Structure formats: C-alpha cells, structure tokens
Design a protein with these regions (language model features):
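One-carbon transfer enzymes
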Residues: 1-120
Length: 120
C-alpha cells in the first residue's frame, strides 16, 4: 500500500487516495496517515462478518471511487454485495493465482521448490 502511494506520487500520476481501510488494527493505517491519506479501521472481529461486509461496502461506495485496490486484504468478499464494484476492484495477491492462494504463500512456494513465482 505504501509503495502504491509513493510510486503514484513519485511519477506525479493524477491519483487521489481517498482512504486506506483495514479490517484489523495495523501499521498500514498509521503509514497511510503519515502519508496524508485517511486511515480507517473497520474491526471485522468486533463487527462480525456480515456487518463488517455491509459497513465496508457502505464506506467504499460513499467515497464513489474510480478504483478500489485490495492489497494485503485477507477477506473473501460477498460476491452479491460487492458485484457493483467488481469492475473497479483490483486484488493484489502475492502468488500467481490460482496457485498458492491463502496464507503463507511464499513459504509454501519454497516448500514445494516451485521455480516460477510472482503476483496476481
């Protein structure tokens, strides 16, 4: 997330970062704020799955973004609820999907001696 913000700024791309939203307390919110970007917490554990997803959808649509980037976001979103946003969402995943989806991606790649690895 920090790299995305810094790269866009370094190349002076016409991008406004509206918010960084996390589902758990994390350093990403602090780093976003340090870069002058709104950092928000929607605590998934406290809200529960359904309320969390509804609140996240409401928050995102309130911003009316041109693009939504999911980076380091370890939640499978409700397809029905988020279908309206699918054409503006990018999910950055640390593997060449569909291989090695889920947690511990890099360790599993190493354990299986895979020669080719990347991001989707």
């Amino acid at each position: 997330m920090v790299s995305i913000i810094k790269t866009c700024r370094r190349f002076e791309w016409p991008v406004d970062f509206l918010s960084v939203i996390s589902d758990r307390p994390c350093e990403g919110i602090v780093k976003a704020r340090d870069l002058g970007v709104n950092g928000e917490l929607l605590d998934r554990e406290k809200l529960g799955k359904d309320v969390f997803q509804a609140e996240l959808f409401k928050k995102i649509t309130t911003y009316d973004p041109d693009i939504v980037v999911l980076a380091g976001f370890m939640v499978i979103l409700d397809a029905k609820l988020f279908s309206r946003l699918f054409n503006v969402m990018i999910n950055v995943h640390p593997s060449l999907l569909p291989e090695f989806k889920g947690l511990n991606t890099h360790q599993r790649v190493l354990n299986e001696n895979v020669r080719k690895h990347g991001a989707s």
